[in-house]
Amino acid sequence: YTHFWNDVTYDKLVRRPDLDWFLQKYGDALQEPYVRGYYAHLLLDYNFLDLYWDRHFRFYNAQKQPEVLDDAVTFVEVLEQQQMYDRQEFFSKRWYYGDYDRMNAYFANRYNVMFPNLEFNAKEWERIRRITEIDWDYAPEAMERTKAQLSQSVAIAEPGIIPQLQIFVLPELEQLVEVTAKKV
């Protein structure tokens, strides 16, 4: 439940975070940087699915009929390309997740993204650990892996060079990030 998906949408391919659920639980702590960062992540996910996916992608079953259930989606159409992809091919390093890698480096350079220092005193850890959806035994390993992936992406990217994306439309995503950041 780290993304606050509710049971109603859990079986769907598109699972938007339930922002009200998050705010009910942590709204009183939004001034804390880690809670605010968590909320920003969920809000960006929500907007990405709600505002971007709905305009650019359609999902189909094996009979090429519209489909929303995760287990039944077989094909993905990228509307501006008028191209249909096999689901496995679409969600691959060549296409969708490859674009993520290229965008991560671009956005990290553009917005000077850095990982925070994770050395906290006991009182800070107490506040941070109030986020019960995080597996705190696994968190350090996940952070190190994510930090390494981002560092690797940034290292191979040329600063100032706009990445050649296969699936995503970068100017729209930049606008989405900026609009979302203003709402946090």
Predicted features by range, described:
Residues 1-184:
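N-terminal leader/auxiliary helical segments
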